[in-house]
Each structure stands twice: as structure tokens, then as C-alpha cells.
């Protein structure tokens, strides 16, 4: 029946999904049970395996210390003995003779289960449960048992009442209450109902399984109307309780039924109690979901068991002595059953959140129950407390042996009552009775007494591990048993059995989740467990008590205490009881805490682990108590959270026991140990840091028994949530200093507090991470299994987090060496945890993320230490950083915050945004940083907005400290208004002068750079950025200068968030700040402070401390903000653009300041700042300055200029919001740089005089081109795929100088607009980058290299992307960047002389064929002008290889190949930042959004006609399908041409910008993207005056931002670009096919031939988004001006 195939199992086909598998190495092989010829014990072996593997049962049974012993016929004693063997024995095959004998004696009168005679496994299973009930609750009847410690009734029994309600007359029959241990269903009815359901519904779903079972169970069970109205009504069954283990017995018509396959296929792995019965009255039952964990099968008169072993997340097959691993999925079991013709008899569904039974009934029982539930073993859902007290039960069995004379009758009575609805009611009844009478006390009691103390722990652990596996066999054994076994199996796999494992699963989820995620569960358990942790041994005890009520726990406490103590002491002492009281106290506390906190906090994974650990706890309680006095407290802390886990760490033997192969048993007794053994290090990595670090790191896990370990895990989770450092101190203090009782008391209090804190923090972390450690339901058994495996992982992760947190604190305190040591330790722990996380993809990702962050932090610390060694600049950043946030030291931005941010400590991020931003940026791992940013995003946006200047200033201050001059700080203070922003920028200019030199110095030695010439400074800044990327310390020195410039910008912008937002008032300022590129991708979306911070970071060119800080904060802010609110992102982007524009003006500000009056207008206050030589400023100032500010404090002027340009960029369509896009600032910068270049020309004449308006600055036709391009692009709304990374950048938006916001195309919606702003920001950034390159970033070339570029400004972004990459970016464009760097270095002076666009410098690489190909690919759908500048516009596309070698860096930058998603913030600093990417993104290439999501550029779509406008010189781009159009001045859209013709161009520009932004190291390339004016035809860029006029002329409301590549990356001299003949080796000047990228490899031809011929595309390229009329006007002007 195909319909049956896994239809009802759905995604939860196997429990493993629910439980995180523990490393198989940590699990000892599952033990088989012998079945010698003639014994015919397979039915018993199957039932026994199921019981053992059911975590709930195993753990609950361990908790039971007292029972009514029946001597030789005591089934309880026999079970205790076998469980002890499971847990402790090293034998692979164990005899079940004792239990078989006790069972036979118990049911001797009934002649059932007699020796040598085969019997029914389901009946055996049910009777064993009833006998257990008799032994532990002899005074109660089977059907009326209310004992809290009765595993059978509390975990397995279904309290039902039947009633008939007539639908016609409404008559109702008297309710018939009854209890059943097994819910029997006819397989025939099951198949029939399944067919009917499938006929009624198109698709079967896993949720239908419960309904299917309900229908099948009542099928044909029709009753007459109670009022005899003649109606035949179906009986209704109402479930009154919430069993954690549901046993479904399948009744077969034949031993060789042909329905076997159909039945197996119809089985579901998830069962909802609400679906199974007509109605459920218990709220828990309504919500509980049980998972198939075990199945007893029958075939050929032989029983075998399948059980899901949560430890290894695999289904195990138990065939007596043979144990085989089936697979992780339920389908694997189905396959085997079909092949083996197995008939499922018992299905065991366990609640992953199930907990051990409460032993409150017993003197220790009350405590026991709470504790049991708290320490749910995930698999031991049924009567879990008893199971949990398994080992303890063994010891308690000795301690409290009592025989219940009426056990037999009770069992019998209960069996019949419970089976009221069961088909085998009578038989079951007798079986139950007999088994109770004879079985439990016989073997179990004897064994229990002798082995309970010693073997109880071991056995428990082993038992817990094996219960699952062996449970598998029992399942296979009998129909009834099978059903139950499946449940148990499922639950253990899940973390607990379905019925009683619901709570345990929750606990397990919480526990595992906590372990995995800062151990919140541990925290909840830690309240109890933390105290235990403090005591080392006490924790396990406490944990078992949590599981065990006081009564049961009494004995278990003794055994647990001794066990936990021995565990703590590395000795397994199952019988140690000295600390019983402490253990009890701890247990009580753990019980409460875990119930309250653990469940919530624990994720499915945690829960399972917790469950397993809990069983161990009872086993370890003695050792806990022993350790209770000493290490036990520490472990106690840990213990509550993760007793089992801790035990694993503590004792290899315990680990082995846990390794018994049964996760449930391991959790109970050996599973926790196994988990710890395999994952102890990984778990400890995170857990120890909090518990171990504070409390003596090692002891916490080493000395905590398994149970204690579970508590510890919980505690650690809580502590971790509360704070790594926080949990640490507690554990450390309690471990050694206090007596057991004192420590216990303190631990209880601490655990309560820690659990709460950890819960809250875990919730926060979870919220930030989007991970729910305790999901309401598990997707499948596999998930539950994963949960189980995460125990050790959780611990390791928490320890690592704790250590890392300490490292951050030390770093903040300035102790970099100690911080580095701790960071390395955290890295090692994270690596261990990574192994533990192998079970879960999420866990793996989490650990990997944190590992990357830690690695980056370590690198940043190393860099910082290096910086401190060369304290010239670092000292300044340090000074500034303290000003910003005491937490961050010079490189603080890199050091402390990353992890905090990752921890999603939004509050911290907010308070220490700058610091955290930097750290985040530096440590920015694609996921972690973004997560951090996500958490930061809202906060940082608001806080930054609130105090952007302060945050940004702080960041800038720290950055600038080294390079900052008074003027720089003044600039910081200056920003009081948009105008002031520019002034500040100019102020920054002054600092830039010094910082620029510093940048150079920084580049060289971090301290002397600021004294290098501005150009040098830029180049050095780039290089330093590059170096800083390599060496966080270097970035820090560079950063200061930039910080200064940016600070001014940020301050002005930040002083009034409105300034950032209100960059409209600062038209020039609102342009993207080139400095931003690093952080821009993140910060762009952030408020000004963040943006500024990013700018500062970019400006400081990876000023590691600031860079990391800013980037992190901004990135965090950005990531969440961008995805969540594009509008916010856009506004942030705009703010950032303004800031970046300011910073750019600061960086390029000197140039602009000296070059453009327009820029100067806004930055007039800073005009006083000494402008760099006009030539230099022009040549490389825009980008050089940007780089400078990015790289050094002296770049601020450049940034100011950038700011001015930013306004232009915004005017040209880059909204500030765009700037917020990581790479958008870059787009803004290119425009800014263009303007700067033009202004620089003007400034040459005007110096700081009045810089023409941005509109006038650019050549008219360039502007027109840009306008059209923007227009068309906006129309198309198809930004380049490359731009996609920064959605804001993706859209090409031209904003009018007077307008802050991008002029959105009428058809754009807000999202499109936002995306466009992002794209435009990217585009403008690219333009600015081009300008920067054009400006003459000869020295920046190094930085501009994909690597060097990444190393510098882009390095910042990339660093954010990969904080661990202190060196050059590792992108494929690295080579290009290197070439670019060299070219830029060479071309800096060239670019400087270049009037508007120094294209010679950047043209080689930029326009190389390969580079153009890349650009074309990334910019597919965008027009690549054939002109050399056009390639600049779209750095991705290659211009003629020889003539217009686009700077490789630029291309790369634009190409989306760079991992921009992670480091969306692309440096807009200069062409050098552009990572050359040979590949061209196809128009359809999905651009990674700033949120890290691949998205098509907003405007890009296959429907959009894409064409590359290749320069006449023969630049052609290959790899992208572009409309074959060659853009030359003739081909460029004229006034008569439709705007659409420009859409591709603008799109190209946008894409280029986007790509640049997208590509962390490709920012400069963006500049090329924007440069349309470049033409091989010798289109001469209008004189500076022309450009200035163009920009300045008020007649052009849409301010076109000519992208002047100030940096050497775009250093192709303007004369080369405009006047120079085709570069040698370049393709023919004639039009190129747009659809075919050049064949030449940009690397070869571009670099080889045109390193000297790079043309600054930004020179003449204006990216303008304006109304059609204005665009037409602009075009007309451009045409007139350039006379195309």
C-alpha cells in the first residue's frame, strides 16, 4: 500500500531528528541479552531492552530506592540487577536469567512466562510494568494507583473512561473508567482506516496518525444507544491523564499476516495524545507529542526489538544477543521490517520532554519526582522518575527493600483494569499479576541490593544508554511489547518516551538546547545544578533528586551521592551515600528549577541530554555527595544543568557506562557519561568556561557525576545565558571554598538565580539567533535524537562561550595577552564542541560561527597586541575607545564585542555599539556576525540614531586616537548639523592630513603612517587597511585617522540622528561615506552612529579595533534591519551615506575641500583644514582620502569630501538608506569621488574656495549618462546581481543634492526603493571607489587589491565578513586587487594629476577583459559603456583589455563572487578596495542581500534587457548576456534617446556599485561602475569647472555625482580615459558586443597591459537618478558639454 509508506511518519520518521546523537565514540556498544537454546527468552529480552532504552523508565526506575521485595520472585530486584549490568557491565551480552526466573516465579500460579516457554512480548512488557507497580506501590490497586513514584501508572498507564453518547437522542452511558498500560489496536482495522483516510484525503500527513489509531481502535466497536433508541453508536474514550510513554499494541490476525508491510508503512513516528483519543482532559496531554522510539516485532515465533538510540541518533536492532545498527531514519527500520517480514507488535511512543517519576510519595519521593521531571531523560518518559532513580533505585532497593504481599493481586487487578479496553484484558491482567508477584523483586531486588550502589550508577548510566537499544529488542519481541517499546524507543531517541517523556523531552530539549546554546537548560538546572556544580559531586545528586521525589530519592541520593562524588573524584562510587541530604536539597532545587527553567530553556537536544544525564545522576548521587563537599558544588552548578554530561567528563568509566550504547541509559546512568566522554570536551568547552572558569573550570565537569553533569549542563546553560563570566564565578567559588551543606545552600540560591538569568539570556540568545532551544514539538525522531546528542556539545559550547566572555572582559580591561589566551582556549573548546555539534546541523553552524568569531577575536587580539607594541596609533584608538565605550580598547572593536554580539546581547550591543560593532565587524562571521547585527540592528539603529555621534564618535575616537588631531576630534565635535557634518568632514580633513600621513605610517608601522604624505597616507591607508585586515592591530592605527574624519562626519551626523537621517539637509553629506564600506554593508542600514562607525572603520581601513567594533555593530544593526525593514535600512543607509559622504569628504575631503567648493560648501567649516595638493587630492584624494580615513585618521577629509560626494551620490540616487547597505557607501563614494574629482579640479583652481555644486562638478554628458543610467536602471529596477548583496546599493538611485532620499522611479515600490537605495549606494560607492582610484590611489593600490583592498577599507568589510582574515581578502579577486594596488600605487600621482577621472591608473585592471567579464556577469542587465570610464561604472565588466583594463580590484569588487553576504559592507574607500573579480555575474545572478539572502537585484530580471555598454576602445565583457550595444559617446543615450537606454547603464552602475559593495574588497571598483564619461574616444572630461558647474549648477536639481576615482585603483589618468588613445592591447576602440565579454583575461591583459592605463571611470561617471525631464536636461547638457 503505497499510501502507507511513511505517510504517517512524515519528517519524523526517526527519533534521531529529535535527539542530537552523541558521538558514537562516546557510546559503548549496546548490550544484547542472551537467549540460550531452549530458554525462549526473546520475548522477555525484547521487553527488557525496551524498558532499558526508555529513558523515562530507566531514569525513573533508578530513582526508586524502595520496593516491596519478593525475594527470588522479585521482578524489581531482577530489573535493578539487569539495569546495573546494562550500565556497568563490560560484557556485550548480558544474561536475563534472573529476570526470567523472577518472572516465572511471579506468574507461576498463572502458568505464564514460565521458563523455557515462549510467551508474548507485549504481555510480558505490560506485566513487567504492573509488577513494578506492585513492588513500588503495593498498597494501591492497579487501576487506582496514584503514587507519584509509580512508573507504570505515572508514565505508562493511560487513565481512560469510556462512554457512549447517542448522536440522535443524546443519551449517554455511564462512564466506564479504566487504566490500560497498552493501547491495543487491530492491524486489520488500522489498515482499513488508513485506506479510508487516504481516500478521504489527498495527502496523508504525520498528524493523521493519531486520528488513524483512534479510528482503528474504535472501528467496529459499536454500542447500542443507552436509551435504546436503536442507534448504534461508537464508543468514545477520554484520556484523563498525560502519560509520557504510550504503548500501542498491534493485534494481528495471523502470525504471517500479509498486512505487515502495510501496517509498517502506516505507522507514524509522531503521536499526539489529543489525536489518539476522542478527548483528553489533561492540558499536558493536549499539547504533548510523543515520538516513536521503540518497536517490538515478531516474526517466525521470535521477538526482536527496534529502538531508537538517542545517543547515536540511530535505530538499533536487538535480537537477543545480537545488536545491530539500523540507521538514523525510521525508514531504515521500515525497510528492515519489510525485508525481514517483521510484524510490529508494540510501538513505544515517548515524550521527549518526559521526566522521571516523582518520588515525593516516598520519603525522598516527593523530591524525587520533581527532580525526576526536571532531569528528564528524554527517553524515559514513562514513570521516568523511577527510571531516573534506576541506579539509585538499585541502591535504594538495598536500602529500602520491602515486599508487598499483595503485589500479585494488585498487579492482577491493575492489569485487568488497565486493559479494560485492551483486547488481551484477561491475559494481560494475569500476566501483570504474575509478573508482579514473581518478577520484580526476585532478580531485581537481589541484584539491586548488591549492585545498586556500586553498579547502580554504572548500570544506570549504561542502562540509560542501553535501555534504548535493548528497548529495541523488547519491541521486536511482542506485539504489545513492541508497541510500548516503540514508544519508549522513540522517546529515548527523542529524549524521552512519548507518554511520560513529554515533560522529559521538554526538559531534554531545554537541557540540550542550553548545552548547545549557552546551556540555558543547564542554567535552569543550574539553579539546582549550579549549586551542585559548586560542589562537584552534589550536582549529580541534586539532579537525580530532581528526577526523584524525596522518597525514592532517599536511596538514590545515597547511591547518587556516592556516585556523584566518585564521579567527581573520577571514581565511580555507585554506593556512596554520604551526601544524601545535600543531594536531596540540590535535587529539590534542581527539580523545581529544572521544571521551571530547564524545560523552557532546554531545547529538544538539551532535554534528551538532560534526561540521560539525569539517569546518571541517580547513579552518581553518591559520588555527587562525596564531591558535594568539594568539587561537587561546582559540579552541582553544572550538575543541575547537565549532570550526565558532567559525569561523562568526570569519569571515563562513567562515560563508558553511558556509552553502554543506550542514550537513554546513558542519560540515566551511562548515557550522560557517554555523552560527556565523547563530547565532554566539546560540551565542556562551553560549559566549563562558565562553570569551570569561574569555579575552577576543570573540576566542574571532571568532578560532577553524570546526573550532576546534567545539572551542570543546565546550570551552565543558565549561566551561559546569564553570561559566560557570570556562571563561571559561581561554579568556581562554590567548588572549593564551601562545605557541602553551605555550598549546597548557596548552590540552590545560585541555581535559582542563574537558571532565571540563563533562561532569560538563553531566550534572548534564542530570539536573536532565531533558535528555539525548546520547540513545542519536534519535527521527527531524528531531531529528538539530535537533541540528546547535544548535551556534551552544549557544555563545551557554554564553556567556550564563558571563556570567550572572560576573554572579552580581559580585552576590555586591556589585558590582551590573557584575553588572547582565553580566546584560544575558547577556540579549542569550540572545536571540541564542534565535534559534539556534529549531530546537529544547527549546532554545528552555531559552534562554527562562534568558532569563527573566536578565531577572529584571537586574531584581533593578536593584532591589537601588535598594535600595542607599536602604540603610536593604537594608543590613540585606545584613548578614544574608552571614550566611546570603556569596554573597547584600541582594538576593542575587534576584541571583546564579537562574541557578545553573537550572543545576541542586544543590550550590550546597544550600549557598546561602537565597540561591539567593531568586534562584530571584525569577528563577523557570515552567520554569527549577522546574527549579532540582527540583535544589534534594532537596538543599534535606535541607540545609534539617538546618539550616533557619540557611538560613531566613540568608534571614530578609538579609531582616530592614533591619527586624530585636535581638528579631527574637533570635527567629531563639529557635527552639529548637516552643514556641520561637512564642516566636520573638513575638520576631519585636517586630521586627515595628519591621519593620512598616519595612515601611511599605519600602513607602514601603524604609528608613523599618519605622517606620510596624504597620497602616501592613502596608499598606506589602503595598504594598512590591507595590513589591518591581516593584522587587526594595524587596522586600528589606520582607523584612528579615519575615525577622526569619520567621527566628525558621524558626530555631525550622529549629533543629531536627523543629521544622519537628515542628510538631505547635508546633500553632500548624505552620500555614502567611503569609510563606510567596511561597515557600510552593515552600518549602511544602521543609524548614523553605526554608519559613521562603519565609515570610520572603512576610513580607518580596518582599524581593527574600531573597524571591528563599528562593523560588528553596524553589521549587526544592518543585517537585522535590512531584512526586517528596508525603509529603516534605507534611512540608515542614507544616514550612513551621509556619514560616509562626510567621511569620504573627510578622506577625499582634502581633495574635495581643496577641489570642490560644492563639497566645501557643506564642509566649509573644515575648509580651514589644509587641503592636500590638488593634484594629489584629485589623483587619489577622494579614494585615497577615503582610504586614508578608512585606513587612517587622516582620511576623514577624504570622507568629508565623500560626504559631500555622498550627498551627490544620494543626489545621484543613492539614498542614505542605500549607503546603509554595506556596499552602498561605496557607491556614494564613487559619486562623491567623481564630484570630488571634478571639484578637485575646481579646487585646484578654487582650492577650498567654493566647490561647485555636485551637479556642476560632473561633466554634463557624464552626468546625463549617469542620469539615464540611473533612470533606466530605476525603471528596470534591475540592479546588478552583484549589487544584490547590498540590496540598497542594488538600486541605482540618483538623489538630488537638495534631496536626501533617492529619487525613486515612479514605479518603484518602497521595497524596490529601499533595494534601489541599497543598490545605488553600492553603485555610488563603486563610483566613488572609481573616483578614489582615479584620484590617484597609487599607494592605495595595495589596499585596493582584492586582498589589499580587502585588507584596507574593503579589508574592513571583509574583515567583518571574515574577521579572522587579518590578511588580504581571500577572494578570487585577490590577485586583481594586488594588481590594482600596484597599479593604484603607481597611478596615485597619475590619478592625482588627472582632472576628474584618473583612469590610467585603474584602467588596466579595471578594464581587463576578464575583469570586465566579471563585471558584466555581475552587472548583467546593466549597460557597460565601452568607454574606459564606463567599465568603471560597472567594474564587473571588462573594458577593452588593453585600453581599458578595469582595475581588477574594481571588477572584483563589483562582482558578486566575493562573499559579500557575510561582509556586505564593501569599502567604498577607493578603487583599491574593489576586489577584481574576473567573473561577470549574469543578470540573473542572485545577489546576496545584505541580509545574506541571495536575491536578484531589485530591478534585475530576465525580462529586463541587459546590455553592456562597452567602451569604444574595445572593452568587451564576456559571460553575461547583454544586449549587444556598445556604449560610446555616439551610442550613449542622448537627449533624444529614451531613458530606457540608460536603464541598463544605470543598472550596470548600480550593479557595479552593488557588486563592489557586495564584494568586501571591491569598493573601488564601484567607482568604475559609475564612470560613464570615460571614453577611449578621448571624450575629454569637462574641466573641473565644467564638472563643478555641472554639479554646482542649480539648474540640475538631480545632482549627478561624477564618480571620481580618487584612489589609485581607478588611477587611470583622466587624459587616458578621456583623452588617451586606446590602451595598447586593448580591443579596437570601436563598439564592442555588449553581450560578449572580452576574451582576454583581465588579469593578464588588464594588468600586464594597462596597469598604467587604468582610467578612473568615476572621473566622468555620474550616477544620477532624477526625473525624466531633469535627466533629459542633464543629457542635453552632457551632450552639449561633451558634444557627443
UniProtKB/Swiss-Prot annotation:
The modification Phosphoserine is found at residues 481, 603, 632, 671, 674, 1189. Its EC number is 3.4.19.12. Zn(2+) 1 binds at residues 67, 69, 74, 77. Residues 374-416, 430-578, 607-703, 720-742, 859-894, 928-950, 967-1060, 1139-1227, 1334-1391, 1425-1455, 1620-1652 are annotated as: Disordered. Residues 386-399, 558-571, 659-674, 866-878 have a biased composition (Low complexity). It is an enzyme of class 3 (hydrolase). This is Ubiquitin carboxyl-terminal hydrolase 54. Transmembrane segments: none annotated. InterPro entries: Inactive_ubiquitin_hydrolase (IPR052398), Papain-like_cys_pep_sf (IPR038765), Peptidase_C19_UCH (IPR001394), USP_dom (IPR028889). One of its GO terms (biological process) is protein deubiquitination. The keyword Phosphoprotein applies. Residues 511-529, 720-730, 884-894, 1155-1176, 1205-1223, 1334-1352, 1433-1442 have a biased composition (Polar residues). It catalyses: Thiol-dependent hydrolysis of ester, thioester, amide, peptide and isopeptide bonds formed by the C-terminal Gly of ubiquitin (a 76-residue protein attached to proteins as an intracellular targeting signal).
